[in-house]
Amino acid sequence: LHKDYECFYMQNPPQAIEWLSRGNMPDLIISDIRMPEMRGDEFLAYLKLNELFKQIPVVMLSSEDSTSERIRLLEEGAEDYIVKPFNPQELKIRIKKILD
């Protein structure tokens, strides 16, 4: 992804929230569901309830191929749900479709 996009990596959602609160506005957020300190679905809810960040598309990553979890997260505002492990080319295609 680094060849096509400027990427910033955060260790956990609180670190990402701090980065966003400093005025950084990404075109897209990719978030794992299982993370330390705050779950990905909680991070998604925070973003979608915040006027400044609710328009940022969020792609959720999970090692679980759960239809019910996928549907729930898409209904809660995720732009896409990708199951790990995934093909990097597929991820690039999905990102391009979201950003175009």
Where do the protein language model's features map onto the residues?
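C-terminal output helix
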Residues: 86-95
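Short, conserved "switch-loop" micro-motifs in signal-transduction and mechanochemical regulators
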Residues: 64-65
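Two-component/phosphorelay signaling modules centered on CheY-like receiver
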Residues: 1-8, 49
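Receiver (REC) domain active-site loop signature in two-component systems and cognate sites
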Residues: 35
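Acidic, metal-coordinating helix/loop segments flanking the phosphotransfer/catalytic sites
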Residues: 9-28
